[in-house]
A protein has these predicted regions:
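Short glycine/serine/threonine-rich phosphate/pyrophosphate-binding segments
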Residues: 57-59, 83-87, 108-114, 137-140
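Alpha-helix capping and helix-loop boundary segments enriched in small/acidic/polar residues
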Residues: 3-6, 55, 74-84, 104-108, ...
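Gly-rich Lys/Arg/Thr-decorated short loops/hinges at beta-loop-alpha junctions or inter-strand turns
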Residues: 43-51, 60-73, 137-140
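Glycine-rich oxoanion-binding loops at beta->alpha junctions
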Residues: 56, 63-96
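Short glycine-rich or small-residue beta-strand-to-loop segments that form or flank ligand, phosphate
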Residues: 2, 46-53, 69-72, 98-107, ...
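N-terminal amphipathic/basic leader segments beginning at the initiator methionine
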Residues: 1-48
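Short, acidic/small-residue loops that bind anionic groups at enzyme active sites
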Residues: 72-77, 121-146
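Internal, active-site/partner-interface "lid" segment
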Residues: 138-147, 157-194
Length: 194
């Protein structure tokens, strides 16, 4: 496969620069170069955050904006964002009402989000999570907790973001996002490896 890129070591940073320029009316950069935030986050609402590895556009930065996610943490190609990136995403999304971190069921994301939640608590930010596990091809029915999050994440972000935009409290946002995932099934396939 032919690819158009400059230095592969800079591909994520260059992708983010291009994305930010192309969508400067919707998103903006933060002090952490691996966190993108919505340009206008209404005051007094629950923050909604996501994140994941690069190379899955439009996920994750493409779902930051009005009535969706307020911030996204960005990792390297097919690699989880750092705990610090997830924490910084929570910090920029926090409007004093808590933060809903809605993400996919991948080991690196699970580990780093759990660390970020602990760090956020120390910083005075309440973060609750919903883990997407909609991919029926990745684990049997009786092992749903092992399933990956794939296309269902989009519905989780939209439902959670809409509930936050309507003024729902943190528990209501979490419940709405969880209900979306609980009622979503997808089949993820890959034609080539990362």
């Amino acid at each position: 496969m032919q690819r158009i890129m400059n230095n592969p070591d800079n591909i994520v940073d260059e992708m983010l620069k291009g994305f930010l320029k192309a969508h400067s009316d919707i998103v903006e950069s933060t002090e952490n170069g691996r966190v993108v935030k919505a340009k206008d986050i209404p005051e007094g609402k629950v923050g909604v955050v996501t994140g994941g590895g690069s190379g899955h556009k439009p996920a994750f930065v493409g779902y930051v904006g009005k009535n969706m996610c307020d911030a996204a943490a960005v990792g390297e190609i097919c690699s989880s964002p750092t705990a610090a990136a997830f924490l910084d995403a929570c910090k920029v999304a926090d409007q004093g009402k808590g933060v809903a971190c809605l993400y996919g069921n991948y080991s690196g994301d699970n580990m780093n989000v759990k660390m970020a939640v602990k760090m956020a608590k120390k910083a005075g930010i309440t973060v609750k999570t919903v883990v997407a596990n909609d991919d029926v091809a990745s684990a049997p029915k009786d092992q749903r907790e092992k399933r990956r999050g794939v296309a269902g994440e989009v519905l989780m972000w939209k439902v959670g973001g809409a509930k936050a935009a309507k003024g729902g409290d943190l528990d209501e946002v979490i419940a709405a996002a969880q209900k979306a995932i609980d009622n979503t099934r997808s089949v993820g396939i890959g034609l080539t490896p990362c």
